[in-house]
Amino acid sequence: MLFIIIQKAFGRYYNAPKTGIMSFMRQTLTTMLGKTVKKAAQIRGGSGSALPGLVIEKIDSDFVSRTLQQLPMGVALISGTNGKTTTTKIVVELLESQGLKVFTNRTGSNFTRGVAAALLGEVDLHGRIDADIAVLELDEAYAVHFVKAIKPNYCLLLNVMRDQLDRFGEIDNTAKLLHNVAINTTKCVVLNRDDPRLSSPDFVNDIESPLRSFGVNPKYLQTFPSDDSLHSNYQSMARLYADDTSLEEFKDQHAVIAFGGNDHPIDLNLRGIYNLQNATGAIALVRAILGNSLNVDSMLEALSNIKPAFGRGEQLIIDGQPCELVLVNPAGFRLALASFDPANYATMIAINDAYADGRDMSWLWDVDFDSLQEQGVTAVSGVRAYDMALRLEYDEVPIDFVDTDLAVALRQLITKHTRQPKRIYCSYTAMLALRRLLARYTDVEEIR
């Protein structure tokens, strides 16, 4: 009904030729309507990252492409199954360390409407944006629609994993979605050389833009498994490209990343070994964007100070003790369990099955939970709490409490372990709900 009212009231602007004064009026009107809806959504307690974008999609489908075309350095797109939000945050902060103004979809809302909503927070009332470049995290399927409207100048393709088979079908279909992004990229494609579905000749042969890659020293490939190494004997066909960026060594949060013919030691604030891989990919993309103008020292200093994206290893303080939120999916869960020592931590696991989480819970059986056997799990919650509890039972992990109600389970975790650090592994929608609940106990950064 809202869309019908808007079209009737302002139809002459949206049906007019897309040039000159009418185009300017359309941009201004769309911006004002979108900002109004965004503010109303926030007043009602939402993040303002979904409804405003949906309204924009319905009334003015060209708004995003028209706005992004203003940017002198164009668009860098980041996609893949795992690591998009954190890698995007790293790329943004590294580019900002070089003096650039960067637009990004900071909330991690990685559908096209999320980009539209994020733009509404950055443009002035006439739809003008003050930025040099856009760095956008996009879901694989929505990235395909995005590149039909506006071709990215650069793209970074992280990985292809099977945790979204209920959405995309066969894993090869996910690779095809990313291939479509790659062939529509105009200046440079950066890909994960250790993922055989992204580095195979079938994937790269018809990509016309220059190729760069990132990866890890071969001795660490088992630590960072691709989907094929987890589920088959398929061997990587990875090729080395001229401008490679490689994670050569790491221990805890210290890493040595090689590029430009030199090894660069770095200490990161980001916890989790998967973030070392994300950082390596981010550096590769920033190098592709800036070329010889890159100030390496400034970039590495910025990298050492980057903090986790919300819900991705984010650390809150409750009663003087840390409480970590760790977003999980199949590959992410495996690497998170390998990254974080459970000793002395009270652990909660919260799993939902909404569209953004993935509805097929069979992936839980791909994760090895043996590392939690000694410490056990304090609480299991979320829509799929009992599926998760059953999975833990098979790995002989002790569980204190199971309840599908996140508020009840969170209260159990906090009240039983007031003087102990806490860690919550959670799926995407569970993470969003838990951040709202945690605001009752401590300060939680509001995401707009």
What do the predicted segments below correspond to?
Residues 157, 161-319:
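Acidic, Mg2+-coordinating active-site environments of NTP-dependent enzymes
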